[in-house]
From Swiss-Prot:
The keyword Zinc appears for this protein: no
Observed effect of gene inactivation: Strongly decreases cellular coenzyme Q levels. Increases cellular sulfide levels. Decreases coq4 protein level. Sensitive to hydrogen peroxide, copper(II) sulfate, and mildly sensitive to thermal stress. Decreases growth on minimal medium.
Top-level taxon of the source organism: Eukaryota
Protein name: Ubiquinone biosynthesis protein coq11, mitochondrial
Organism: Schizosaccharomyces pombe (strain 972 / ATCC 24843) (Fission yeast)
Listed GO CC annotations: mitochondrial matrix; mitochondrion
One GO MF term attached to the UniProt entry: protein-containing complex binding
Matches recorded under InterPro entries: ComplexI_NDUFA9_subunit, Epimerase_deHydtase, NAD(P)-bd_dom_sf
Functional summary from the UniProt entry: Acts in the coenzyme Q biosynthetic pathway.
Length: 276
């Protein structure tokens, strides 16, 4: 089985590649940085075909890579637009940014923290915007996959937004889902995890995971009283668990459409059991 992972050198993507190699799959990673996006060299990386190309600039450049592929997994996405890379490079940046956003919105009354802003940013091709990355790139690569006769396209979407984050984040994810689902001859899958964490790859995500674990527990105990918090009220998942779920989803012909958190957990467990 050959799979093509868009964003294979990223936070989630490299977990998908690693687990797919362990399963014996032929794996191709596509990103603008190739294997250069990974800081630590590991043995499994030698078995991945690292393709360096810009699918946003030229989606058709994917066609040779997609030849004979059984599935495409798109793990590309952005959580923020402004200074996104700088925030991630600062170990305290993402935590302080999101916690400050949460604290500034959690206790406001009479407002919906996820309500759309009066103005929506204009679509900007080949730039780092929600419209360009979360929506347009996903749609275009799905169309190219169908053109290349790839039968399965798995898009890593999201459970919800979170207070303080631009509502365009989740809006563009849902728009991508709707358009991709219209593409004929393509089994489209939309994974909807909440917050993803990994103590080894990004230690700072552990702090947020602990916070969201508490808030999600309270939300369940209060029958959804904290639903307005979006992702902050949903159970966080390890990035490896989402990667396992992605591999199970593409290998199971019955899986299509949105896959929510509880289903992700079940699929991850199922794939892990089959791999033992």
């Amino acid at each position: 089985m050959k799979i093509v992972v868009l964003g294979g050198s990223g936070f989630l993507g490299h977990n998908i590649c690693k687990l797919a190699i362990a399963k014996g799959y032929e794996v191709v990673s596509v990103s603008r940085r190739g294997a250069g996006g990974l800081h630590n060299k590991e043995p499994w990386m030698d078995d991945v075909e690292w393709e360096t190309l810009d699918a946003q600039k030229d989606p058709n450049s994917l066609l040779p890579v997609l030849r004979d592929a059984s599935a495409v997994v798109n793990s590309v996405g952005i959580l923020m637009e402004n200074n996104y890379k700088k925030i991630l490079q600062n170990p305290r940046g993402p935590v302080s940014h999101l916690i400050n956003s949460l604290s500034s919105n959690m206790f406001k009354t009479g407002q919906n923290p996820l309500a759309p802003k009066p103005e929506e940013a204009k679509q900007s091709k080949n730039k780092v915007t929600f419209e360009a990355i979360n929506r347009d790139l996903a749609i275009e690569t799905a169309k190219i996959a169908a053109k290349a006769n790839v039968p399965v396209y798995c898009y890593v979407s999201a459970h919800a937004a979170a207070p303080g984050l631009d509502p365009r984040y989740i809006k563009t994810k849902r728009e991508a889902e709707r358009e991709i689902s219209k593409i004929s001859n393509l089994r489209s899958i939309f994974l909807r995890p909440g917050f993803m964490y990994n103590f080894n790859d990004r230690p700072f995500t552990g702090a947020l995971a602990s916070l969201f674990t508490v808030s999600s527990s309270i939300n369940r105990a209060t029958s959804g009283a904290l639903n307005f918090l979006g992702t902050a009220s949903a159970e966080p998942l390890p990035s490896e668990e989402v990667a396992l779920a992605a591999l199970e989803a593409i290998s199971d012909p019955s899986v299509k459409g949105p896959v929510e958190i509880s289903e992700l957990k079940s699929m991850a467990h199922k794939f892990k059991q089959k791999s033992l």
